Amino acid sequence: MSDNSQNLLYDKFELPESVKMMAVEGSGGSVDKQASFVAEPLERGMGHTLGNALRRALLIGLEAPAIISFSMTGVLHEYMAIEGIVEDVTNIVLNLKGALLKKYPFQDSEDGRCTQLLKSTISVDASDLAACGGQKSITLADLLQEGGFESVNPDHVIFTVTQPMQLEIALRVAFGRGYSTSERIVLEDKGVNEIVLDAAFSPVVLVNYFVEDTRVGQDTDFDRLILHVETDGRVSPKEALAFSTQILTKHFSIFEKMDEKKIVFEEAISIEKENKDDILHKLVLGINEIELSVRSTNCLSNANIETIGELVIMPEPRLLQFRNFGKKSLCEIKNKLKEMKLELGMDLSQFGVGLDNVKEKMKSYAEKIRSKNVKG
């Protein structure tokens, strides 16, 4: 029987320190409805894994309010015209589908996610018509007289009045996910003349993702994930990404509950946490100055690796390409570097060191250290 009480130690995963949000070209710098998010570096393959999962969660998982039915004075069904109104009921229905309502169903709020009936009275007299040139447009803002809902597009025209009248209008608003046809919407207390609408609940309009190559130190075998998110304004792209991440985490937690060994990951070495002078003293050390087996020392010598700096800048896959360099030598070297608080594939760019100049830089730094010690 396996012992599940001890954690398993896994090699570190390269992870982004943060996700960068950028405005999309042509948006005027606004990120209210469109934004791109960049996450790098990610281990090879993780870009597509995360990108596809986030895209699906963004498209199907987010909730927002939408009008699911309406009733209006004198309207018996959706295939009729109304005297004094330019649009027939079919066009009014289409206009109501384009209404974008915004409200956060907070957990502690009185109504929460409950369906709400929003009633309004529209009164148009002769003076109103005269002021508008004979036709008065009734907008979404005119219909939201109660309920605490904001309108993303308050000037969206629902219908146009051409003669004095008074109308009683009731909108039924519900929260949901995705898209629901009128046939799938069931109203327990549906009114006799209440017309049920198709409802577009999802606030996300478009999601695309791209994966590019990026580098960590001298190793280019990593992913950069670029996620483009466009919403209709009921939530911002930043909110949409945060909400979808929580939805995925909720689903992944189901599988995490399996009674198996837990994994802990080695932490990446951060140069900022160490004194740079201390690190430089370690980097200029010769390979023969640390305690390695004869086999590992010979392997590094044959690869023309003379200093610790030349060793730690080398990506792990590249080391394994050298002749006679196997997993056993690799494991020994990694353990020794770990004791020194170093690791393979380190980014030494802040020291001005790259694969193309590491030898000469190590010699230069070694001479400076020796000169400093002599003067001291």
Swiss-Prot record:
EC number: 2.7.7.6
Record GO terms (molecular function): DNA binding; DNA-directed RNA polymerase activity; protein dimerization activity
Ranges for region Alpha C-terminal domain (alpha-CTD): 276-376
GO terms classed as biological process: DNA-templated transcription
Sequence segments annotated as region (Alpha N-terminal domain (alpha-NTD)): 1-259
UniProt cross-references to InterPro entries, sorted A to Z: DNA-dir_RNA_pol_insert (IPR011262), DNA-dir_RNA_pol_RpoA/D/Rpb3 (IPR011263), DNA-dir_RpoA (IPR011773), RBP11-like (IPR036603), RNAP_asu_C (IPR011260), RNApol_insert_sf (IPR036643)
Cited Gene3D superfamilies: 5' to 3' exonuclease, C-terminal subdomain, DNA-directed RNA polymerase, insert domain, RNA polymerase, RBP11-like subunit
Catalysed reaction equations from the record: RNA(n) + a ribonucleoside 5'-triphosphate = RNA(n+1) + diphosphate
Any one annotated GO CC term: cytoplasm
Keyword annotations of the record: DNA-directed RNA polymerase, Nucleotidyltransferase, Transcription, Transferase
Family label: Belongs to the RNA polymerase alpha chain family.
Biological role stated in the UniProt entry: DNA-dependent RNA polymerase catalyzes the transcription of DNA into RNA using the four ribonucleoside triphosphates as substrates.
Domain notes: The N-terminal domain is essential for RNAP assembly and basal transcription, whereas the C-terminal domain is involved in interaction with transcriptional regulators and with upstream promoter elements.
SUBUNIT field: Homodimer. The RNAP catalytic core consists of 2 alpha, 1 beta, 1 beta' and 1 omega subunit. When a sigma factor is associated with the core the holoenzyme is formed, which can initiate transcription.
Protein name: DNA-directed RNA polymerase subunit alpha
Taxonomy of the source species: Bacteria, Pseudomonadati, Chlamydiota, Chlamydiia, Chlamydiales
Gene name, Swiss-Prot/TrEMBL: rpoA
